[in-house]
C-alpha cells in the first residue's frame, strides 16, 4: 500500500510518497505548473500508476479561521477533477484488478511554515528553499495523514 501527498502551489505542485508500511513520507518531486495546476493531473495520474498508489492526500489550504478561500476552493475542484479522471481511467482499463485510489483532502494550514522550518533545520540555505518547499509541504501533508491513521 502506498499513499501520495499533494501540495498545490502556485508555481509547483509538490509530491510525496509513503513507504509501503504507511509509516514515513518522503519527497517525490515537483511538477512545474506556472499557475495552472490543473495541468498537473496528467503527471499525477502517471505517478499513481507507476507507484501503484492506493490513496491520494491533497492539501486543503484553509484560512486561519477555518474558512475556505479561493485557494481551498481550487484545491477542492482539483481533487474532484482528479477523482473524475481516475474514474474514467478505471472505466477505460481492461484490468479487472484496477482499484481506484481514494482521494482525500486534509487541512494544510501552516504546512509551508513547517516545511521551511524543516528545511532550515536540515541546514538548507533559505535561498534554496523555493525549489523544494512544495514537495516538503507535501511530505508534511502526507505525514500528518499517516500519523492520524495510527492514532
UniProtKB/Swiss-Prot annotation:
E.C. numbers: 3.1.-.-
Keywords: Cytoplasm, Hydrolase, Nuclease, Ribosome biogenesis
Source organism: Bifidobacterium longum subsp. infantis (strain ATCC 15697 / DSM 20088 / JCM 1222 / NCTC 11817 / S12)
Pfam family, one: RuvX
Cellular-component GO terms for this entry: cytosol
Annotated function: Could be a nuclease involved in processing of the 5'-end of pre-16S rRNA.
Family annotation (SMART domains): YqgFc
Protein name: Putative pre-16S rRNA nuclease
Disulfide bonds: none
Sequence similarity: Belongs to the YqgF nuclease family.
Enzyme class: hydrolase
GO terms under biological process: rRNA 5'-end processing
Gene3D superfamilies for this protein: YqgF/RNase H-like domain (3.30.420.140)
HAMAP family: Nuclease_YqgF
GO MF term list: nuclease activity
UniProt subcellular location: Cytoplasm
Amino acid at each position: 500500500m502506498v499513499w501520495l501527498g499533494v501540495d498545490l502551489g502556485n508555481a509547483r505542485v509538490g509530491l510525496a510518497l509513503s513507504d509501503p508500511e504507511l509509516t514515513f513520507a518522503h519527497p517525490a518531486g515537483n511538477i512545474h505548473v506556472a499557475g495552472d495546476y490543473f495541468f498537473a493531473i496528467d503527471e499525477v495520474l502517471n505517478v499513481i500508476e507507476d507507484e501503484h498508489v492506493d490513496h491520494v492526500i491533497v492539501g486543503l489550504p484553509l484560512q486561519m479561521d477555518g474558512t475556505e478561500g479561493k485557494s481551498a476552493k481550487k484545491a477542492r475542484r482539483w481533487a474532484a477533477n482528479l477523482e473524475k479522471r481516475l474514474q474514467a481511467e478505471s472505466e477505460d482499463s481492461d484490468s479487472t484488478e484496477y482499484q481506484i485510489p481514494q482521494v482525500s483532502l486534509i487541512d494544510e494550514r501552516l504546512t509551508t511554515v513547517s516545511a521551511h522550518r524543516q528545511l532550515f533545520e536540515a541546514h538548507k540555505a533559505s535561498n534554496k528553499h523555493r525549489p523544494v518547499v512544495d514537495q516538503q509541504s507535501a511530505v508534511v501533508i502526507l505525514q500528518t495523514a499517516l500519523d492520524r491513521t495510527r492514532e
